From Swiss-Prot:
Residue ranges of the TM segments: none
Record bears the keyword Cell membrane: no
GO biological process: tRNA methylation; tRNA wobble uridine modification
One GO molecular-function entry: flavin adenine dinucleotide binding
Oligomer and partners: Homodimer. Heterotetramer of two MnmE and two MnmG subunits.
Residues holding NAD(+): 275-289
Binding of FAD, residues: G16, A17, G18, H19, A20, G21, V128, S183, Q372
Organism: Geobacter sulfurreducens (strain ATCC 51573 / DSM 12127 / PCA)
InterPro entries: FAD/NAD-bd_sf, GIDA_C_N, MnmG, MnmG-rel, MnmG-rel_CS, MnmG_C, MnmG_C_subdom, MnmG_C_subdom_sf
Protein's UniProt keywords contain Amino-acid biosynthesis: no
Taxon lineage: Bacteria, Pseudomonadati, Thermodesulfobacteriota, Desulfuromonadia, Geobacterales
Function: NAD-binding protein involved in the addition of a carboxymethylaminomethyl (cmnm) group at the wobble position (U34) of certain tRNAs, forming tRNA-cmnm(5)s(2)U34.
Designated name of the protein: tRNA uridine 5-carboxymethylaminomethyl modification enzyme MnmG
GO cellular component: cytosol
């Protein structure tokens, strides 16, 4: 094919406009880089291919972090959501999480508008079929119609599109998702360049016609009132919310599913890719948990101006006749019509251990990977990676050091470290349990952790940063006030003392000491402290958490300080593991495969013992001394 060179050269080229691609392109453009976003379909920018929702357990943490760094996802869901809830409100602050139902089409359209109006960002429709690589560096991309776009850096955010194959029963056909063509050729070139390309699988349920659902027989689930925004920049959300509905499968449903397993691509061996462990299909759940007589599903509206409903928990790749029978066996859905069939999709991904923590590939300089190409699942995981890839591609263009978030700084840092240190053989999703310092990585303090970083790279606007500094200052001032303000026994309200078991109080207590008690919150404190009632809610929340959990927080900070010694020791790129005495053959093999960037990463590789880490540390110090 004769290639046509496009007239303009770019700083950053992003291939793919899903949730990773959008954040990557916006970050690079907002940092002043001339950025090109290429996508197979401009009408599918930020399309929610699966559930119409943002956030959830640990995923809400990622969205808050994206927002704190200056990303767009939090603002977008605040502007287009139709129901908002805080999960785990009865548990500790470390595991509380925000979740919102989205108006699927409004979400897509608003994100597209934001990108169209973004300075330094160009959007073009085109399928990237190859990379331009010279002397171990990426120089640009080639599209299906023969246009070569040249750029200093390239970010691949291919989603489920690389050699995507859709399955409905034993019927399968190429597709990146329902209604879109797959990307062909790119994964073959990546394999030729030395990348390890694997195969994964995911799936989605049918979309149901709400006009054919009997909602009177289902249990409604309402959002929180008032709704709590995702973005630290959103003051409030005033739009009315829509309910979801809870339904359950039954034994008849399970019998129907079992009767169709001979035509299931999952159980007949047609699907080769590994599916998501934590988001199994309904046939998988029925077979893995035969003792369960029912499984829950939330019927989620896809928007205000559509009748389509998404039945979460009921994804399947069974044939369409079985799909009709299984959905209609559920109470309230006896007459339901399927508007879009459920399906499974297989796609190629690249082993993420071939990435640096900056998300730049180890094999090709200036090439970055983000999102499902790295083996992750979920919009939020993709967006977090996309944001970091966009930031680091822009920093490379600007000649600056990459921004790498530590495991003690952000869930984004935990996720990327997990991926590049351990790799993945199944779709990776974020959980709070993956973070060893989760009390430090709460949703509520994402701005305190990351706003400085976002402002330093140019993503957090000056006005947003000013408001953040004011909030941080007020938190510090309030903590100091509570340490000095006192409840004196001679002046205390007897009823207050009696209520909280302090009738024998002899010595003065500071308000900080009072607030440390589990039975006293700001609401109770305001009975004896008029100033407490005037403290802004966001400041109250921070102050109360910091006081009540002070001992636990200090303990985790001590753990972080010890771990940073390993994290701060970089392993030279040209360190020859084969000549270091004392390393076992297994350890050498693991180190040569994973090529860790730091001693901290090396310590997390399965099979690399503390003794081996000590030997590595000595080898690095000896090398530094001799040079």
């Amino acid at each position: 094919m004769n290639l046509i060179d496009y007239e303009k050269q770019y700083d950053v080229i992003v291939a793919g406009a899903g949730h990773a691609g959008c954040e990557a392109a916006l970050a690079a453009a907002r940092m002043g880089c001339e950025t090109l976003l290429l996508t197979i379909n401009l009408d599918a920018i930020a399309l929610m291919s699966c559930n119409p929702a943002i956030g959830g357990l640990a995923k809400g943490h990622l969205v808050k972090e994206i927002d704190a760094l200056g990303g767009e996802m939090g603002k977008n869901i605040d502007a287009t959501g139709i129901q908002y809830r805080i999960l785990n409100t009865r548990k500790g602050p470390a595991v509380r999480a925000s979740r919102a139902q989205a108006d699927k089409q409004l979400y897509r359209l608003r994100m597209k508008h934001v990108m169209e109006e973004q300075e330094h960002l160009s959007l073009k429709q085109g399928e990237v079929t190859g990379l331009v690589v010279e002397d171990g560096r990426v120089r640009g991309v080639v599209t299906k119609v023969g246009v070569r776009f040249l750029g200093k850096t390239v970010i691949l955010t291919t989603g489920t599109f690389m050699r995507g194959l859709i399955h409905v029963g034993l019927t399968n056909y190429p597709g990146g998702r329902a209604g879109d063509l797959p990307s062909v050729g790119l994964s073959d070139q990546l394999r030729d360049l030395g990348f390890t390309v694997g195969r994964l699988k995911t799936g989605t349920p049918a979309r149901l016609d709400g006009n054919t659902i009997d909602f009177s027989r289902l249990e409604p689930q309402y959002g929180d009132d008032p709704p709590v925004p995702f973005s630290f920049s959103t003051e409030r959300i005033d739009r009315p919310q829509l309910p979801c509905y809870i339904a359950y499968t039954n034994e008849r449903t399970h019998e129907i599913i079992r009767s169709g397993l001979d035509r299931s691509p999952l159980y007949s061996g047609v699907i080769e890719g590994v599916g998501p462990r934590y988001c199994p299909s309904i046939e998988d759940k029925v077979m893995r948990f035969p003792d369960k007589d029912r499984h829950q599903s939330f019927l989620e509206p896809e928007g205000r101006d559509t009748v389509e409903y998404y039945p979460s928990g009921l994804s399947t790749s069974l044939p369409i006749d079985i799909q009709y029978r299984l959905y209609r066996s559920i109470e309230g859905l006896e007459n339901v019509e399927i508007m879009r069939p459920a399906y499974a999709i297989e796609y190629d991904y690249v082993d993420p251990i071939q990435l640096h923590t900056s998300l730049e590939t180890k094999l090709i300089r200036n090439l970055y990977h983000a999102g499902q190409i790295n083996g992750t699942s979920g919009y939020e995981e993709a967006a977090g990676q996309g944001l970091m890839a966009g930031i680091n591609a822009a920093l490379r263009v600007q000649g600056e050091e990459p921004l790498v978030l530590g495991r003690d700084e952000a869930y984004i840092g935990v996720m990327i470290d997990d991926l590049v240190t351990l790799g993945t053989r199944e779709p990776y999703r974020m959980f709070t349990s993956r973070a060893e310092y989760r009390l430090l990585l709460r949703e509520d303090n994402a701005d305190l952790r990351l706003r400085e970083r976002g402002h330093a790279v140019g993503l957090v606007r000056d006005e947003e940063y000013r408001l953040f500094l004011e909030k941080r200052e007020r938190i510090g001032a309030e903590l100091e006030r509570l340490r000095t303000a006192k409840l004196l026994p001679s002046e205390a309200d007897p009823s207050f003392l009696e209520t909280y078991g302090m009738t024998d109080l002899r010595n003065a207590l500071t308000f900080e000491q009072l607030l440390r008690r589990p039975d006293i919150t700001y609401e109770e404190l305001s009975q004896i402290d008029p100033v407490a009632g005037m403290v802004p809610p966001s400041v109250k929340e921070q102050v109360e958490i910091q006081i009540k959990y002070q001992g636990y927080i200090e303990r985790q900070l001590d753990q972080v300080a010890r771990a940073r010694k390993l994290e701060g020791t970089r392993i030279p790129d040209d360190l020859d593991y084969t000549v270091i005495p004392g390393l076992s053959a297994e350890v050498r093999e693991k180190l040569l495969r994973f090529l860790p960037d730091t001693l901290g990463q090396a310590s997390r590789i399965q099979g690399v013992t503390p003794a081996a880490v000590g030997i590595l540390s000595v080898a690095i110090k000896s090398r530094s001394a001799s040079s």
